[in-house]
Amino acid sequence: MAEYKAPLRDMRFVLNEVFNVAEQWAQLPGLAEVVDADTAMAVLEEAGKVTAKSIAPLSRAADEEGCHWENGAVSTPAGFIEAYKTYAEGGWVGVGGDPLFGGMGMPKVISAQVEEMVNASSLSFGLYPMLTAGACLSINAHASEALKEKYLPNMYAGVWAGSMCLTEPHAGTDLGIIRTKAEPQADGSYKVSGTKIFITGGEHDLTENIIHLVLAKLPDAPAGPKGISLFLVPKFLVNEDGSLGARNPATCGSIEHKMGIQASATCVMNFDEAVGYIVGEPNKGLAAMFTMMNYERLGVGIQGLASAERSYQNAVEYARDRLQSRAPTGPQAKDKAADPIIVHPDVRRMLLTMKALIEGGRAFSSYVAMQLDSAKFSEDTAVRKRSEELVALLTPVAKAFLTDLGLECAVHGQQVFGGHGYIREWGQEQLVRDVRITQIYEGTNGIQALDLMGRKVVASGGAYYRLFSDEIRQFIASAGSELDEFAKPLGACLDQLDGLTEWVLEQAKGNPNEIGAASVEYLHAFGYVAYAYMWALMARAAKAGEGDEAFYTGKLGTARFYFARLLPRVNSLVASVKAGSESLYLLDAEQF
């Protein structure tokens, strides 16, 4: 693998020149006192150093070694304990955490960049702090003050970790049929019993305690999803003075043997009357858990982005160094036996596809993160409502589109290496294996597409969609003639997406299958148009940029490539959606 270098220049461009995030922070009382442009850039610079120096060098060896289970205990690969200690002591686990309990208090748009850096360094490693931060979000939003005071400081400090225990052997997407039970006790606690599977970070040796958030049902709970409650179940009970007490019967029965993320412990967790404490109200557990889902799903999208970035950095270095054949137009490196493969059109196509999708994804994920910040911190109810609705609309796109493209980019990066990309020592095949899970967990991408199409577009009668569409139209209307090469094709594709949205809304009235039939390709069409909007914004900023000519001309060249070679994918997606659901049901089940 090439030495990982955090893409700080591009992050600064997106945050400062494209979105001017400091202006947003100044208008949000919860952030104005905490962060400004200089502070944010200092945070990102330091995060870049920590991830590149302490985490990235572990990735290849950790993939080979993996995690090991023995008698209920899980050991992580060599170097992980020390790297996690360094990461935690720097405050990075709590980078977006509540300052009242020891968090750094950075806005989501900054913690999103940190997430990209840590996941590009090692996706397996990044899962441990990600799950802890997610658990903290739910605890902070829904738990009692006593639970918050008892657990959050050590979790933000990285001394304790967190996990989310949702899935059961028979219950994945349909959590309403879970069987884990919680029995009330006289002292106000609960005894939690059941088995959970696919639990990331359910057991490991990185922290002295692990705080599990467990979905379970009370004895008198209503059937289905409306009968689910959320419980905090610590690995070790915590005494009144904050010291660790007895071991709770929340144990790891085994770890999964899987395709990728070998250094992340994916556990089967057994709860045998484990002591737990309710988080939020009885039978409102899904609402409490879903507080963090928008953050977590954006985080998974960023994992796809991060894997693509790491693969791209490796592929660019290899393409510059690898000598094979001569350029079609004649020798470029006349003093060498062959030209670097970066001169060949197809290699350039793959590299530019990666670059355009990565940089578009970085801008889009930052945009969504800014909406999360507005929804959380704005005191203007209208602003907060608009941001909440945009978050609802865009989160499934961020999760699914970034991870689908993350796999595409990782495969391109592997392909640039040719046969060497298939060999483990180069690291490219690891990135393909690792990023694959991002399309599956935190809600499969098919489920994300159904969420976008059914719950967000159709259920709102297109109102959520029009919020975003209208914003893009306002940008197009205000763009000067110098942006015509981007604004005009953006407008044309937006017209297509508007028409497609209306078509699906109409078709769904008569045939519910049309939603499912359209959903994945609709999400992709939406994603390409959203990226076109991001690229038009970036082109405007690049045209206004001063100094650093190579960066800005490179940005404009990549924008032109996106509009010329990638945005036209919308055409085939629209045609496919409008073919309807009929052909999906021409075969009986036995004919497959």
Describe the residue ranges of each PLM region.
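A short core secondary-structure module
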Residues: 189, 193-247
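A structural-propensity feature for long, helix-poor, extended segments
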Residues: 133-135, 144-147, 442-444, 452-496
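Glycine-rich cofactor-pocket loops
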Residues: 32, 64-76, 288-299, 313-354, ...
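A glycine-rich, basic-preceded beta-loop-alpha segment at the flavin cofactor/substrate interface
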Residues: 198-200, 237-253, 258, 265-296, ...
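Amphipathic, small/basic residue-rich leader segments at the start of a protein or domain
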Residues: 1-126, 150, 373, 582-592
